[in-house]
Amino acid sequence: ASEGSDTVRETDPGSRKRVVTLIGIGMGTPAGMTAEAAGAVAASDLLIGAGRMLEAVGNPGRPVYQDYDAQRIADYIRTHPEYVRPAVLLSGDIGFYSGAKKLYEALEQVDCEVRSICGISSVVYLCGKLHLSWEDVCLKSTHGRKANLVGAVRSHEKTFAILSGGDSVGQLCRELQEYGLSHVRLSVG
């Protein structure tokens, strides 16, 4: 490949270096992906990710492996050397409570180069839509973990939280009201 190029060219199949690209797909729509992310998806020979990520980018005629577990993904890549440009699709920006953290560790066991392409962060996206700067935002996540959101809201002028599914927004509203914080402005996106 030429310098600065993300394309791997096969000259000698025995000497090709596998390149695994971790791609943050942003908000989960093709329009919300960066051009770099879309280009890496197009250049890949295998798409890997949770079902929602695979659906978000589409897969015209391309093999897919649906999974979100870092070790299983690394094992699949290791045991399928026919794929030299697999792309692992991750939500958001690959830095805020992302599966990329465990993937970096798991891929150390695979003979490959790992590249990262950041997507648009949900905090950046939502704050932009709300016309708010985000340098003073307290960042929290209850997606698969516990966090004291009431304490964060009480202690910070701006708190951004990634919530779990279901009734997590309703539950947060009830907790805020219960702790005397019914006056706070809540934006959901």
Predicted regions and their residues:
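Class I S-adenosyl-L-methionine
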Residues: 1-120, 124
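A contiguous loop/helix-start segment that scaffolds small-molecule binding in enzyme catalytic cores
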Residues: 1-22, 84-86, 155-189
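Short hydrophobic/aromatic-enriched beta-strand-loop microsegments
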Residues: 63-69, 111-115, 134-141, 181-188
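Hydrophobic side chains in well-ordered alpha-helices
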Residues: 76, 99, 126, 149, ...
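Glycine- and other small-residue-rich loops at beta-strand/loop junctions that grip anionic moieties
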Residues: 92, 115, 141-142, 161
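Short, glycine-/small-residue-rich phosphate/pyrophosphate-handling segment
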Residues: 122-155, 164-165
